[in-house]
């Protein structure tokens, strides 16, 4: 029976894999800019890597907004390099009880600006053309690559977005020369290790920020993070005042910043936390602790909390876009889809994430009106405000 069952499962898996196209395009960004993607390897010579005598190396993706008139040619490129796609597919297969579609990540593509007019430099004039730089820290044990569509969508609204991998934390980091560092060292079943790994992310963030500011020393800086990356946002803002504003996408908080909060500097640092499904500060002790600390220590500091009751934790990732563009919602099955991404279509979630992120950073980095952050909008009923 075991052999027969294995054969049947293999046949089903092969049928499912053959049902997806050899490649499919993730949603094209809806903003006014085309987007260029640069894959960069950065070496921090001032730090040793974890349990190593070698300097710490990072991989980042930099998404640059390019005015349409300066983009000569677009190209559809793989979202994931081969080894990353293979490992992440295997992890998703195991986590979903076999309901994930093998080969889905390898088949995904994003459309990028592949050729920019000569003379247009993305980091010229020392201020990145007045375009803010947003740093993005991914979820725990999660590659930056599963935020490519979200980063590209935000970038298309007029932001340089830099997504970061955190080696030994991230499931897999694939370097330009083919070197691979696998992760999984951040164990959420052992909370005592999380402040350490949170601090590693903060150090990575400060290093990447320093590199970005070498060519754009006057650029305005913000930060976003999902899940464990959301904790890195708060801690990085407390550590480095150059980060003027930040958004935490559905992440629990770790480290001393929870008890100090933001608002102790002369320069304001607006902070937005955005939960999904039932997650909010009334059921997350770390969020509540931060809120009370800021109300006590910095009562005038700008902070707000949003929610997406119909969303899921992975609404703030590319999983909805990958599933919808790959046409596999029905293949994966309603029960698994409900847990993984919920019912909100990717096109819709990408749109409201983009516009709320845009209004927040226009307000916090440029002093414009709060826009959608003023309160509930009939145009985006999925997004709720918590008192």
From Swiss-Prot:
Q: What is its EC number?
A: 3.1.1.47
| Disulphide connectivity of cysteines | none
Entry's Pfam families? PAF-AH_p_II (PF03403)
Instruction: Please list the GO biological process terms of this entry.
Output: lipid catabolic process
An example Gene Ontology CC term for this record:
extracellular region
The reaction(s) this protein catalyses: a 1-O-alkyl-2-acetyl-sn-glycero-3-phosphocholine + H2O = a 1-O-alkyl-sn-glycero-3-phosphocholine + acetate + H(+)
Q: Where is the signal peptide?
A: 1-17
Top-level taxon in the UniProt lineage: Eukaryota
Keywords assigned? Glycoprotein, Hydrolase, Lipid degradation, Lipid metabolism, Secreted, Signal
Which GO molecular function entries does the Swiss-Prot or TrEMBL record give?
1-alkyl-2-acetylglycerophosphocholine esterase activity
| Active-site residues per Swiss-Prot or TrEMBL entry | 227 (nucleophile), 250 (charge relay system), 313 (charge relay system)
Q: Where in the cell is it found?
A: Secreted
**Protein family:** Belongs to the AB hydrolase superfamily. Lipase family.
Protein name per Swiss-Prot or TrEMBL: Probable 1-alkyl-2-acetylglycerophosphocholine esterase
């Amino acid at each position: 029976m075991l052999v027969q069952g294995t054969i049947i499962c293999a046949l089903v898996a092969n049928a499912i894999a053959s049902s997806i196209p050899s490649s499919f395009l993730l949603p094209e960004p809806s903003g006014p800019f085309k987007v260029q993607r640069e894959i960069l390897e950065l070496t921090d010579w001032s730090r040793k890597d974890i349990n190593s005598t070698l300097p710490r190396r990072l991989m980042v993706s930099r998404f640059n907004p390019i005015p349409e008139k300066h983009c000569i040619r677009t190209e559809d490129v793989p979202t994931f390099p081969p080894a990353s796609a293979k490992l992440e597919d295997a992890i998703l297969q195991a986590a979903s009880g076999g309901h994930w579609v093998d080969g889905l990540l390898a088949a995904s593509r994003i459309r990028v600006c592949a050729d920019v007019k000569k003379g247009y430099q993305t980091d010229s004039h020392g201020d990145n053309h007045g375009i803010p730089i947003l740093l993005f820290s991914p979820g725990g044990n999660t590659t930056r690559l599963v935020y490519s569509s979200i980063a590209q969508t935000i970038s298309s609204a007029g932001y340089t977005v830099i997504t970061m991998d955190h080696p030994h934390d991230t499931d897999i980091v694939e370097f330009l020369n083919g070197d691979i560092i696998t992760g999984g060292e951040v164990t959420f079943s052992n909370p005592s290790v999380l402040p350490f790994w949170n601090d590693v992310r903060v150090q990575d963030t400060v290093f990447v920020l320093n590199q970005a500011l070498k060519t754009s020393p006057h650029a305005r800086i913000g930060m976003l993070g999902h899940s464990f990356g959301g904790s890195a946002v708060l801690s990085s803002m407390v550590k480095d005042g150059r980060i003027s504003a930040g958004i935490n996408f559905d992440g629990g908080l770790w480290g001393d910043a929870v008890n100090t909060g933001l608002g102790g500097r002369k320069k304001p640092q607006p902070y937005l936390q955005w939960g999904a499904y039932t997650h909010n500060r009334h059921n997350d002790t770390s969020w509540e602790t931060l809120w009370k600390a800021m109300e006590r220590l910095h009562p005038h500091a700008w902070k707000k909390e949003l929610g997406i009751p119909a969303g899921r934790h992975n609404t703030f990732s590319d999983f909805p876009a990958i599933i919808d563009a790959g046409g596999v919602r029905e293949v994966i099955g309603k029960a698994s889809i409900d847990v993984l991404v919920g019912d909100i279509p990717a096109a819709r979630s990408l749109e409201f994430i983009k516009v709320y992120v845009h209004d927040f950073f226009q307000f916090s980095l440029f002093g414009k009106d709060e826009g959608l952050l003023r309160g509930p909008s009939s145009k985006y009923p999925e997004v709720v405000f918590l008192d």
